[in-house]
């Protein structure tokens, strides 16, 4: 969706641990990168054995959706939360000042499943805050699974609290 709307797309992993990652999904190149989506991913633990090879590629910094699709999976996103959060200094820096402080950012939290014709494998809960110029594709299927809803709340809190380390404008800086 970012590439179709803005002509380019990239993923910059800002922070990553064994169970979470914070990423900048951007358009542009080099010093012209503009954050279109800031994503906090909480990986479902333990990782399903059928997803381990793809998971390693994702931990190496590759796009979650593109990696899973290349491995033959289809993606199913089940909406957990739809809300707005305010732009923080971190989002403003990643968006190269194209968003104002406190500006509303449309935000979704969803459970991502990697699916085959025979199986549906829970992979992650993802919270995404969107640049005002980038409206995300719709995926409105809702889940009531308690563990996923709890993970959604944790990911949303991390998305709201996330700050760039002192002096860091963008991970490429």
Where are these regions (language model features)?
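N-terminal domain-onset segments
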Residues: 1-109, 113-173
